[in-house]
Amino acid sequence: MSNPFLKQVFNKDKTFRPKRKFEPGTQRFELHKKAQASLNAGLDLRLAVQLPPGEDLNDWVAVHVVDFFNRVNLIYGTISDGCTEQSCPVMSGGPKYEYRWQDEHKFRKPTALSAPRYMDLLMDWIEAQINNEDLFPTNVGTPFPKNFLQTVRKILSRLFRVFVHVYIHHFDRIAQMGSEAHVNTCYKHFYYFVKEFGLIDTKELEPLKEMTARMCH
């Protein structure tokens, strides 16, 4: 029997919200195809994330950030009906970790929010970042801003929190769908990438430390 979750995550026919695409013919589109080809060929994920010889680091990172955003979006989208104000009144990763939302607009101070509200603000915020031409230029030859990697670190740290919440609070739903292997593959790909380029502080990775040690040994 076909797995609907697998179809959603890997064929990406359905999205939680509009996803950013790469324009055919651009350098970044070619990098995206190269990255996908490595995954489809079954290449070791540790090797698949490495910067190809002669390629620009910022371009490689940009391609992966957009891809991870799309994939994490879909993972959360598949369990979002079970992540409600009632079931998850606080955005957390178990009893030891609570994530508060802060931005430059409405929430200038770290604010406790329900998980679905936090997720909605998070996805809106990331979407705004990756659609900002000043941060993620799409024209070949347009330089990335000096704060690009700093912004990427913030994006990836916040995306990691989605994995934390899903694994700790909604893994039963993932298992019920028979989709743990697919979510685990997405997580390993994400983890190896951020470790390869030092894009998330070790402290931020603590909530899933034991699971990661077993899964990504």
UniProtKB/Swiss-Prot annotation:
Entry binding sites for Zn(2+): C83, C88, H165, H170
A cellular-component GO term for this protein: cytoplasm
Biological-process GO terms, alphabetical: signal transduction
Domain of life: Eukaryota
Keyword entries, A-Z: Metal-binding, Zinc
Molecular functions per Gene Ontology: metal ion binding; protein kinase activator activity
A family per Pfam: Mob1_phocein
InterPro entries to which the protein is assigned, alphabetical: MOB_kinase_act_fam (IPR005301), MOB_kinase_act_sf (IPR036703)
Function: May regulate the activity of kinases.
PANTHER family documented for this protein: MPS ONE BINDER KINASE ACTIVATOR-LIKE MOB
Similarity-based family: Belongs to the MOB1/phocein family.
Protein name: MOB kinase activator 3A
Organism this protein belongs to: Homo sapiens
